[in-house]
Amino acid sequence: GQAGAGGVGDPIEVISPIDGSHLTSLADGDAALVDHAVTVARAAFDNGRWSKMPPAGRKAVLHRWADLVQANAAELAVLGVRDNGTEIGMAFRAEPGSAAATLRYYAEVCDKIYGEIAPTPDGILGMIHKEPVGVVGAIIPWNFPLMIGAWKLGPALACGNSVVIKPPESAAL
């Protein structure tokens, strides 16, 4: 995937809820920008690099992502405190660790989602064929965005889908 610059209208000013200081400015989006993001995500899905990757490959990528979340847990916790005012103890205890655990859970799901079928009569072939469906839109809330983002991204990516994320304006970092 990739982050898109784009944006329309006035930028969204990211203000620290702690002291009111200006953290950064982000591009604002509109329906056309969302449509473009979905088109790009669909093209990425259709090229098959992720959607047709063997489950073991997706599993390895999700585990690597969890490793990176854990390795950068302190920085991510501080970012959550500065961005949306998460209480510092909660930020360190809950969010990065929960996000990493969620990503690891779905990494392990990658090669275990094939299920079983009920017995069928002689001469009848029963099958389950599971495949990614395409592009998933994930709207991330302001409260615990890293953790809840992992709840949405983990299952979608584990199944081979592409994802377009809509972060909250009040916790967009």
Region spans (language model):
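Residues that cap or flank secondary-structure elements
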Residues: 8, 68, 91, 144-145, ...
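Single, functionally critical "micro-switch" positions that shape active/binding sites
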Residues: 15, 53, 159
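Glycine-rich loop-to-alpha-helix module at the N-terminal edge of alpha/beta enzyme cores
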Residues: 23-113
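Conserved small-residue-rich beta-alpha loop and adjacent elements
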Residues: 116-173
